Amino acid sequence: ICTGAIALALASERPDCEIIAVDRMPDAVALAQRNAQHLAIKNIHILQSDWFSALAGQQFAMIVSNPPYIDEQDPHLQQGDVRFEPLTALVAADSGMADIVHIIEQSRNALVSGGFLLLEHGWQQGEAVRQAFILAGYHDVETCRDYGDNERVTLGRYYQ
């Protein structure tokens, strides 16, 4: 879920997999489509969708997402490169957790039994994200650290 570099990298590195990438912003979809064409990546389908709305009835072995997870009051939003990004791509309500929780809950209907959900999140959100996974019924929940030793990606497995 999201059409940026992660989806294109997955498709490029795993030509044996079919990747479906979604984004609600038309400009992001158009850019990803141009990049996929420029890079000659054939195993990716890029759709405009508000999370799962265009994916009704489909089931996936794995869902990977880099959703908005920054608190709208975070002072870093006024610094560095993020100043040039659309806020809707960065900011989520409820201390940055609203979209994460939504994806965790909605992914249960979109995963095959035993399928994986992987979510990037803020470096201080690991515990809250793990708890959201567990409360939603996911198993084998774990958080991976980035190169700066910060909790950055949480994954879990959901059984129907």
What does each of the following model-derived ranges do?
Residues 27, 31, 65, 85, ...:
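Residue-level signal for the nucleotide or nucleotide-sugar donor/cofactor binding architecture
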Residues 94-158:
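Conserved Class I SAM-dependent methyltransferase catalytic core
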